Structure formats: C-alpha cells, structure tokens
Amino acid sequence: MPDWSQDDDVMPEGFQLLPEVLDTERRQALIAELSGLPAGAAGQRELLDQPWCQALAGWLHDLPALQPHLAPDAVAVQCTLFEKSPERNWLVTPHQDLAIPVASRVDHAALRGWSIKGGRHFVLAPAEVLARMLAVRLHLDDATQADGGLRFVLGSHRDGVLDEAALRRWREHAADVAVDARAGDALLMRPLVLHASSKASAHGRRRVLHFLFGPRELPFGLRWQIG
C-alpha cells in the first residue's frame, strides 16, 4: 500500500492523507456529540448549524497542515456525517463532487443543475470555484477498504469538470488507488478528483465528518448557504 501521508503543497494526486489529526480525547468527544443527534442524522448536510461543529471547523481551518491547501479566503460551508454500518451500507461509483450549497437560486446562463436537498438550494458549481475548494474528511473510525474506504483516480482533478467520455478515459487509463485511513486521520481531497467507495464488508461502523471549505466570495451573484 502506498504511503500518502507526506504533505504536498500542490496535492498532485488530488488527495492527501494526514495521520493522527485527532487525538483520542478529541475523537471521543466528537463521538459523544454525534450520539446526541436525532436518529437518521447520518447523511444530513447541516451539521454546521451546531456550535460544536462550527468550533471544529474553525480548529481545522487553522491547522498548519491545511494551510498550503486552503484558499486564502477559505470558509467552511458544509459538514456532512457519513456513516456506514451493517444496517446502513452502500457503494458509490466513480464521480466528482460538483454540487455546492447556496443561499438562494440565481438565474444565470452559466448555472445549471439546481436542486433542493433538506430544504436547501444546491447548484453545480463553476469549475473555477471547485478548483479552489477543499474537502476534509475526519475519520472517527477506521476506514480501510473493508470498511468502505475511498478509492481515487490519480490526478483526475486536473481536467476540471469531466463529461462522460472524459470520465471513461480517466477510469480506463489512470491508476485507481485505495486509501486506508485510521481513526483520527484526516483525508484531504479536491472535490474534482474522481473517487468511489465499495460497500463495507467489515461489521463495524465507519463514521466520517466531511467538511467542505470554499472561497468566501462566489461568482454570478451566488452566496453560500452556511450550515
């Protein structure tokens, strides 16, 4: 298994593993916070409404290891809890993360793919916005391939938003790399990098807090929906 833990300020593969970002005490405190969420909270995108999550986002933003990868004006715009378990298990085919949460719909020829999820507006972001964004996945449990961890297509973020033909070319001709993360690790990734995951075959839980950071200002009159 390759070692993806070495920091790289240009993130050429489109992702970077940072080991042991959370110590045991902080990780257990976060697990305790999650235990107080209502049933069915996994998959919800509004965790930044919670004060503890806002504080965690600020702590992440200021981590020295993240500074080379964040836009100078980066703000946290979303946090989602993903949880795989024997009762809640799924696979995800290779894809890019293209939708962003915004405060309201804006009619502009450059904007498409509008949707409403959980009562909030989402739009397919312009490529120049996505290129400046960073996702930070905080692992509260191990996320090996047996736990349904992520696989990446190396360097695929460099081609911007991919159409179906380009996606097939990348899948056929570029390396697909599995990343095993341990509890407490942080996995950084560009939303434009092709990534996928399989169903978990292990019997434990795989809880991940998926933070999204983006530039403070958006084009075309868009504004972030923070939360």
Which stretches of residues belong to each language-model region?
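Non-heme Fe(II) oxygenase catalytic core, chiefly the N-lobe of the double-stranded beta-helix
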Residues: P2-S5, V10-E13, L22-A183, A196, ...
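Glycine- and charge-enriched low-complexity intrinsically disordered segments
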Residues: I226-G227
